[in-house]
């Protein structure tokens, strides 16, 4: 009979029966009882009451029974730490058992019991197992060191286990070497500064020797370790590559990806003139192609990694286009990834083949896939200039199918083709206009409106077409409204006499009838431009547009280099560095590729050159979307660096003159408009303050930076509060506050002894918390604390402790021990102690980031009864590391744009509105934007605390 019988029982009150069976003299009965206990535990029943009875069964020679008891022990040791100590003697005994399987089982279980109380008892058995004669025991003990380090790092260091682990790298058994490497890598990742894996050519040679003999998972550990090594020159890099290359033909896809990672990294150091370099490129293609014949889930992971490889080195797979053609039974997520890679590999040589495929895909039934295929045709046109005409012809064929969603996607991509190749394909506009009535998606409607506005002089009835859109203006999405506003202003500047009523109608709708601040602001800007200087308006609105970038979705080069170092990990699937998604960022190391050799740089061909050319050599193109995302993802690497001032063109200067601070003087002027129309400037009261200026448009100079920002005077410190009253702590009273001085966080404590006995042996510990706060040093009370004595201590804190989200976010649970007892209390720390000194963001970056953070992440607050002017507020906030990036005055209202950064790299952007010189209005308005919205409430509380004290 199978073991399934143990899971079918529904008896009640069986704990007593099991207890009796566990204490039976018969071995078989005991084993049956333990199996029943494990079955109950597996289905979620609480059998912790049987702990002492199960532990008694450990004293057995039966390996199966011992395994079951150890399984039970691992599960319940944490909830029964006092009882778990009972098992220590058996562990010690089992670690000396003649059977290596039992020795290994004992040491494995020891590592899985995460109970502080018993860790010190396990050191001696572990030390013996690390030097055991049997390699199976040694390899198990190596992993146990990493587990023990996670529970008590200091203990592991004090006991010298790390040195023993390093010695195991030279072990004669390859599996021991692999496990030692895995354990050291794990420890090194959680303590990046420890320099545990101090690799040198000798140790690398040992690892490469072990690589050929250990299991597939052992090979992965060793390859990942090799990827962290920096060869001293290109000869050593080539030697390592030669010995790693055979792993490319391994059956396990994880081994293949780890080998690819090592080769991609070390190829950076090889000269392109070398014959070996070309050979290596050829060897990399077949294993990557083979990965695409695996099951869909593996294919997806492989494709996400190939996407990175193709961006870094397209020459590897340039002849393998066919393997990325979509199969009818591929899941949608595989299809979309394949499409993306097809576009990246598209070139003049294979474009005919690619277009034929894409046209075929556009007739499929899967709507999402069809949309992506149509977009892909447009991207091919932009990437391969010689194919543009063929692509436009293909898109027109698809429009003739009259399939609604195909038509709409085609119009969206044709807009981009017009941008890339001006005055070349405008003959198709008539065909596009025929489909105007069928457009119901915002993006397609916006694209069509852009085309009509941009080429209004070529379309006879452009005013009628735009007027038809204007009829339902308030029902349109914001995207369409903004595009319609701009298109009608363009039309007016091209045909002023015929469209006066139309432009006044749209400006009125945008500025007076709309609640959307972006739309309102753009309406006011156009209105003022037209009413003040029509010539400048023409220069701004009808300015020559920059070229559209060939690859709008290439990953930014520095981010790409970092992601190449993470091939085969979750980061390579997300296309984000670990610091962007690992909670708290603890132990996250930023990796980068080795520097290129001089010969490899000089030999780089134009086709394969990476996209990050120096700024002086780049054409004036729209920055790739990936660039901005890359910058935002890497904001936590250090303070934003201000670049040199940008040279503004005459058009940009015009925008600044029109809009920068001199708005009041414009309000009364009503010069002659274009075509004799008098534009009345809009009412002053309704002018909103908004940051919606495009980056680099000159509108960013609306910010009027003042030199009167306050100087540093030390972060605000709250008065001490009683955290633990004497009546709850047997006479020990603890008061305290938190401070931040010159980048160091401290907990300032006041300990008072209100008991009748002397207090000694003080220690302190924090529970895991949202920002990893932990004591950076022991609690030093140098002399015994006598009755009625008070002592003040400043305890330095670090932010590298364990992270766990607390409720509320700034909750800190503390345990204080002395010779009397252990006492627990919780307190709320002010968030401003986590505001770091390099939290001032560059103005351009501020604008880009503000726009990039979704509007739903914005939070609005009011700070009541705070009669401060802008200078005083800015000075107070700067002393607590809230930095003023820019200041504006709009209609008598001071606007401070501010940035701050938390210790875990989260940026918070703020807009603070102040009414200066108005004693009746002392309320300040605060808008906060952040990628982690749950932080906003606590940042607001910090603002209120700092400004009111």
Curated annotation (Swiss-Prot):
Compositional bias of kind Low complexity: 594-611
Organs and tissues of expression: Widely expressed.
Location of this chain's protein in the cell: Golgi apparatus; Cytoplasmic vesicle, Clathrin-coated vesicle membrane
Bilayer topology annotation: Peripheral membrane protein
3'-nitrotyrosine modification, residue list: 574
Family matches, as InterPro entries: AP_beta (IPR026739), AP_complex_bsu_1_2_4 (IPR016342), ARM-like (IPR011989), ARM-type_fold (IPR016024), Armadillo (IPR000225), B-adaptin_app_sub_C (IPR015151), Clathrin/coatomer_adapt-like_N (IPR002553), Clathrin_a/b/g-adaptin_app_Ig (IPR008152)
Listed GO MF terms: clathrin binding; protein kinase binding
Name assigned to this protein: AP-1 complex subunit beta-1
Organism per entry: Homo sapiens
Organism placement in taxonomy: Eukaryota, Metazoa, Chordata, Craniata, Vertebrata
């Amino acid at each position: 009979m199978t073991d399934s019988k143990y899971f079918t029982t529904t008896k009640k009150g069986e704990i007593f029966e099991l207890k009796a069976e566990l204490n039976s003299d018969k071995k078989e009965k005991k084993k049956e009882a333990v199996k029943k206990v494990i079955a109950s535990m597996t289905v979620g029943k609480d059998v912790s009451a049987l702990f002492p009875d199960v532990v008694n069964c450990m004293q057995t020679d039966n390996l199966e029974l011992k395994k079951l008891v150890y399984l039970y022990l691992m599960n319940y040791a944490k909830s029964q730490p006092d009882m778990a100590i009972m098992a220590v003697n058996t562990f010690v005994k089992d670690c000396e058992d003649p059977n290596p399987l039992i020795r290994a089982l004992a040491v494995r279980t020891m590592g899985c019991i995460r109970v502080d109380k018993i860790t010190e008892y396990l050191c001696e058995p572990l030390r013996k197992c690390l030097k055991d004669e049997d390699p199976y025991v040694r390899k198990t003990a190596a992993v146990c060191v990493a587990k023990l380090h996670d529970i008590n790092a200091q203990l592991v260091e004090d006991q010298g286990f790390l040195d023993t682990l390093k010695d195991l790298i030279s072990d004669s058994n390859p599996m021991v070497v692999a496990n030692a490497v895995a354990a050291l890598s794990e420890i090194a990742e959680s303590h990046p500064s420890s320099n545990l894996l101090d690799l040198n050519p000798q140790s690398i040679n040992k690892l490469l020797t072990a690589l050929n003999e250990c299991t597939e998972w052992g090979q992965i550990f060793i390859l990942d370790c090799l990827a962290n090594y920096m060869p001293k020159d290109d000869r050593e890099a080539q030697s390592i590559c030669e010995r790693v290359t055979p792993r490319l033909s391994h059956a396990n896809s994880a081994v293949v990806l780890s080998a690819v990672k090592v080769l991609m990294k070390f190829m950076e150091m090889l000269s392109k003139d070398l014959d070996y370099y070309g050979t290596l490129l050829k060897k990399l293609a077949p294993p990557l192609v083979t990965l695409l014949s695996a099951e869909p889930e593996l294919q997806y992971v492989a494709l996400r990694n190939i996407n990175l490889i193709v961006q870094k080195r397209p020459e590897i797979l340039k002849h393998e286009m066919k393997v990325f053609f979509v199969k009818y039974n591929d899941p949608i997520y595989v299809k979309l990834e394949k499409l993306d890679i097809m576009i990246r590999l598209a070139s003049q040589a294979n474009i005919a083949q690619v277009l034929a495929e894409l046209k075929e895909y556009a007739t499929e039934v899967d709507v999402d896939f069809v949309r992506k295929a149509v977009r892909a045709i447009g991207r091919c046109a932009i990437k391969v200039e010689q194919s543009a005409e063929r692509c436009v012809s293909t898109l027109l064929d698809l429009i003739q199918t009259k399939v609604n969603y195909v038509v709409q996607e085609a119009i969206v991509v044709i807009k981009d083709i017009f941008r890339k190749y001006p005055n070349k394909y405008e003959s198709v506009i008539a065909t596009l206009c025929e489909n105007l009535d069928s457009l119901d998606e915002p993006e397609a409607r916006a694209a069509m409106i852009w085309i009509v506005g941009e080429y209004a002089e070529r379309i006879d009835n452009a005013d009628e077409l735009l007027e038809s859109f204007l009829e339902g203006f308030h029902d349109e999405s914001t995207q369409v409204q903004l595009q319609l506003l701009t298109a009608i202003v363009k039309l007016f500047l091209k045909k002023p006499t015929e469209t006066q009523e139309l432009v006044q109608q749209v400006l009125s709708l945008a500025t007076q009838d709309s609640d959307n601040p972006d739309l309102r602001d753009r309406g006011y800007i156009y209105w003022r431009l037209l009413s003040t200087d029509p010539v400048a308006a023409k220069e701004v609105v009808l300015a020559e547009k920059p070229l559209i970038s060939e690859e709008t979705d290439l990953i930014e080069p520095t981010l790409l280099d970092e992601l190449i170092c993470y091939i085969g990990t979750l980061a390579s699937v997300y296309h984000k560095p670990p610091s962007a998604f690992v909670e708290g960022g603890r132990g996250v190391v930023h990796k980068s590729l080795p520097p290129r050799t001089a010969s490899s740089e000089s030999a780089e061909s134009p086709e394969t050159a990476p996209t990050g050319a120096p700024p002086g050599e780049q054409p004036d193109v729209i920055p790739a979307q990936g660039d901005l995302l890359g910058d935002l993802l890497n904001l936590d690497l250090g303070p934003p660096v201000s670049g040199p001032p940008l040279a503004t063109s005459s058009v940009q200067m015009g925008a600044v003159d029109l809009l920068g601070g001199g708005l009041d003087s414009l309000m009364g002027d009503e010069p002659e408009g274009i075509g004799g129309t008098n534009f009345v400037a809009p009412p002053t009261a309704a002018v909103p303050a908004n940051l919606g200026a495009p980056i680099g448009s000159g509108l960013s100079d609306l910010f009027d930076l003042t030199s009167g920002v306050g100087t540093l005077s030390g972060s605000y410190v709250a008065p001490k509060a009683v955290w633990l009253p004497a009546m709850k702590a047997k006479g020990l009273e603890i008061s305290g506050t938190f401070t931040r001085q010159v980048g160091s966080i401290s907990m300032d404590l006041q300990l008072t002894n209100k008991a009748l006995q002397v207090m000694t042996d003080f220690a302190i510990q924090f529970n895991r918390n949202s920002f990893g706060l932990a004591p950076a040093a022991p609690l030093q009370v140098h002399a015994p604390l006598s009755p009625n004595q008070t002592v003040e201590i400043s305890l330095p804190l670090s932010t590298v402790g364990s992270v766990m989200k607390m409720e509320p976010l700034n909750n800190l649970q503390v345990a204080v021990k002395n010779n009397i007892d252990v006492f627990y209390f919780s307190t709320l720390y002010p968030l401003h102690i986590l505001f770091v000194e390099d939290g001032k963001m560059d103005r351009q970056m501020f604008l880009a980031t503000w726009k990039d953070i979704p509007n739903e992440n914005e939070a609005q607050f009011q700070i009541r009864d705070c009669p401060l002017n802008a200078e005083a507020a800015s000075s107070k906030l700067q002393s607590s590391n809230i930095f003023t990036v820019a200041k504006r005055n709009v209609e008598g209202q001071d606007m401070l744009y501010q940035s701050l950064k938390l210790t875990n790299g989260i940026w918070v952007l703020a807009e603070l509105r102040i009414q200066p010189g108005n004693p009746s209005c002392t309320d300040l308005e605060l808008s906060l934007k952040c990628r982690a919205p749950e932080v906003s409430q606590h940042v607001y509380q910090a603002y209120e605390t700092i400004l009111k004290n």
